[in-house]
Structures are given as structure tokens and as C-alpha cells.
Amino acid sequence: MLTWLQRDSFQFPPLAKAMREPNGLLAAGGDLSAERLISAYRHGCFPWFQDGQPILWWSPDPRTVLFPQELHISRSLAKLLRQQRYRVTFDQDFAAVIAACAAPRAYADGTWITRGMQEAYRQLHQRGIAHSVEVWQGEQLVGGLYGLAIGQLFFGESMFSRADNASKVGFATLVGKLQEWGFVLIDCQMPTQHLHSFGARAIPRATFADYLQRHLNLPSRADWLA
């Protein structure tokens, strides 16, 4: 039975209570306050819903993750990185990145990054928890992604690309930095062929929860504005 969250409580049900079908649906309701979002990610779940739906919280089993040291870079991407066709920055224009991620796409109906979702993550960015990666071609923003950094874990949310392989350049650059900064795991949430091409793989939800317990409260060496 689906758990409905109360607005005055930031607690989530145990991950083991998530539904098998649809895979990982854990709870519904609540709000998108910064406190609840932080509680959700620390618990191992994330919001994902369409505009007009109640807020839905998910914790799929298995969980798709990328260990930074397992990053796979194709020959074509390695060549592109060497060419330095694009310039990559961090936390320079979070609002523009999340707005671009929310923009309509030809292969999808609607967007799950609603206006309320954008505002919620902008607040997390102001708190130094949500971060953006920008990919520039000259002075034009042509790609990027955003996510949350808590302890030694990075929770990826969404990416976009307006130029060939721009988001791939941004993601590969981010993973390299995360490894340098001592991050141990990148949460990719759901499997995609794009992520698997980088070396992402599925692990049991219980294993993912163990990483949360062991690494969420450990410091990293992150310097997002360096």
C-alpha cells in the first residue's frame, strides 16, 4: 500500500516498502521543501512526477550508479576532450542549466522538471547542496547537467545538450573532478544506454543504501568554484 507523506513530517517509509511495480515507487505527497528533499536523498529516494500529478517519491531496485574510477571514455569522446572545443565550468549559471534541462524535447511528452521543481532545486543550490555543470561554446551555453552533492556521494538529476556531445563532455569532466575530490559513487537513478556507455551499472538497492550509510556524513574535497 502506497504511503502518503504528511506535510509536518520529513520521514520516509523504509526503502524495502517500495513497490515492485511500478519499480521503486515508495511514497506520495508531501512537498518540495529543501528540508524534505535533503531528507529524501539521504534516505535513498528522489522525486519524479509529471505536472498535475501528486509528488511521487522513488527508490528503484536495482539502482543505477557510476563509480568514478570505472568511468569509460570512448575514443571519440577522448579525442573531443583533447580538442578542447568546449569550455566547462561549475556553478556559474545553475538557473540556466536547470531551465534548459526542463525545456521540451522532441522525444518526450512534457517534462518532469516542473516550475516548482526548478524553484526547489534553486533553493538547494543557494544552500550549496545542488550544483551545476555548464558547457560553453564561446559565450553560448550548449550543454550541462545538475545534481546534488552530499558527503562523498553525488546524485545526478538531469542533463541537456544543444551541440554535438556537449553533455558528454560536461559529464566526463564532472566525473573526473568528483574522483579527484574523493567522491565514491554517483547516483544515476534509472538505467539508460547513455549512462551505461560511461560505465554505469546496476547494484542492489540494499547495497546502495549501505553506501549512503557509510559515506553521506564523510567530507569530500570538493571545490566547486575553484
UniProtKB/Swiss-Prot annotation:
This is Leucyl/phenylalanyl-tRNA--protein transferase. One of its GO terms (molecular function) is leucyl-tRNA--protein transferase activity. The lineage of its organism: Bacteria, Pseudomonadati, Pseudomonadota, Gammaproteobacteria, Pseudomonadales. It catalyses: N-terminal L-lysyl-[protein] + L-leucyl-tRNA(Leu) = N-terminal L-leucyl-L-lysyl-[protein] + tRNA(Leu) + H(+); N-terminal L-arginyl-[protein] + L-leucyl-tRNA(Leu) = N-terminal L-leucyl-L-arginyl-[protein] + tRNA(Leu) + H(+); L-phenylalanyl-tRNA(Phe) + an N-terminal L-alpha-aminoacyl-[protein] = an N-terminal L-phenylalanyl-L-alpha-aminoacyl-[protein] + tRNA(Phe). GO terms for cellular component: cytoplasm. Pfam families: Leu_Phe_trans. Functions in the N-end rule pathway of protein degradation where it conjugates Leu, Phe and, less efficiently, Met from aminoacyl-tRNAs to the N-termini of proteins containing an N-terminal arginine or lysine. Its EC number is 2.3.2.6. The keyword Electron transport does not apply. Keywords: Acyltransferase, Cytoplasm, Transferase. Its main location: cytoplasm. It is found in: Cytoplasm. It is an enzyme of class 2 (transferase). Disulfide bonds: none annotated. Belongs to the L/F-transferase family. Gene3D superfamilies: Leucyl/phenylalanyl-tRNA-protein transferase, C-terminal domain, Leucyl/phenylalanyl-tRNA-protein transferase, N-terminal domain. InterPro entries: Acyl_CoA_acyltransferase, Leu/Phe-tRNA_Trfase, Leu/Phe-tRNA_Trfase_C, Leu/Phe-tRNA_Trfase_N. It comes from Ectopseudomonas mendocina (strain ymp) (Pseudomonas mendocina). One of its GO terms (biological process) is protein catabolic process. The keyword Transferase applies.
